[in-house]
Every structure is written in C-alpha cells, then in structure tokens.
From Swiss-Prot:
Entry-linked InterPro entries: ATP_synth_b/b'su_bac/chlpt
Record keyword Transit peptide present: no
Upper taxonomic lineage: Bacteria, Pseudomonadati, Pseudomonadota, Alphaproteobacteria, Rickettsiales
Gene Ontology CC entries for this record: plasma membrane; proton-transporting ATP synthase complex
Subunit composition and interactions: F-type ATPases have 2 components, F(1) - the catalytic core - and F(0) - the membrane proton channel. F(1) has five subunits: alpha(3), beta(3), gamma(1), delta(1), epsilon(1). F(0) has three main subunits: a(1), b(2) and c(10-14). The alpha and beta chains form an alternating ring which encloses part of the gamma chain. F(1) is attached to F(0) by a central stalk formed by the gamma and epsilon chains, while a peripheral stalk is formed by the delta and b chains.
UniProt name for this protein: ATP synthase subunit b
Length: 164
C-alpha cells in the first residue's frame, strides 16, 4: 500500500470527512434520541397514570355498584315488607267489613223474621177472632134455633099429649 496513492488519501479524507460530519451530527442525533426517549418515557408515565386512574375508577365503580346492589336489596326487602303489611291491613279491613255485613245481614234477617212472625201472629189472631166471632154468632143463632126447636117440640109434644 502506498501512502502516496490517491485512493488511500481519498479513503483517509472520506474517513475524516465522515468523522467531522458525524461529530456535530452525533450531538444532534443523541439530542434527538434523548428527546424521543424523554417523550416516550413521558407517554409511558402518562399511560401508567391513566392505568392507575382507570384501576382506581374501576374500584370506585365496583364499590358504588356494590352499594347500589345493597341499596336495591334493601329497597326490595322494604317494599316486600310494606306490601305484606298493606295486604294484612287490607285483609283485616275486608274481614271486618265482611263481619259487619254478616252481622247486619243476620240482624236484618232476625228483624224480618220477627216482623213476619208478628204479622203471622196478628193474622192468626185476627183469623181466630173472626172464626170465634163467627162461631159465637152461629152458636147464638144455633142456640136460639135450638131453643126455638125445643120449644116447638115441647109445644108439639104438649099438644100431642093433650090430644090423646
């Protein structure tokens, strides 16, 4: 290899040229890479923070869901109890109403029964009085007829005795 050869000096010049260009470019490249690294690190930190926030939000949401489930269960239980209580009250009211209606119906039946009994007794008494009155009138008539007949018979027999 000859040091005076053009190819050699061309190669050396090229290496020096590359070195001179690389040196300032190295700083720019390193600065650019450092900036990219910082940017990526910031994005990673933001992503981790978002992940933590999402996990916290998920936990809070789950806690709220649990509270709402508990509240829903309590509300359902309370509404069932209130419903049962209302049903019991209304059932009791209906039973009292029916009992009252039953006693009213029994009282009405007894009143109608006593009224009907009194009417029948009054009709019976009126009929008996009428029959007794008719009997007495017919008996008076009969008595007067009997007395007349007896008198007539006694007169006839008395007249027959006299004739004989």
């Amino acid at each position: 290899m000859n040091f005076l050869d053009e190819s050699f000096w061309l190669a050396v010049s090229f290496i020096i040229f590359v070195y001179l260009i690389y040196r300032p470019a190295k700083k720019a490249i390193l600065n650019s890479l450092d900036a990219k690294i910082l940017e990526v690190q910031e994005k990673v930190l933001k992503a981790e923070k978002l992940k933590e926030d999402a996990a916290l939000l998920f936990e809070q949401t789950n806690a709220q869901i649990q509270k709402l489930e508990t509240l829903r269960s309590q509300m359902i239980e309370e509404s069932n109890e209130v419903t049962k209580k209302i049903i019991q009250e209304k059932t009791k009211e209906i039973e009292e109403f029916l009992e009252h209606k039953k006693s009213d119906a029994i009282q009405l039946i007894q009143n109608q029964k006593s009224t009907a009994t009194k009417e029948l007794q009054d009709e019976f008494c009126d009929e008996v009085i009428k029959l007794v009155s008719e009997y007495f009138q017919s008996a008076k008539f009969s008595e007067s007829n009997i007395a007349k007949n007896l008198m007539d018979k006694s007169d006839s027999s008395h007249n027959n005795d006299k004739s004989t």
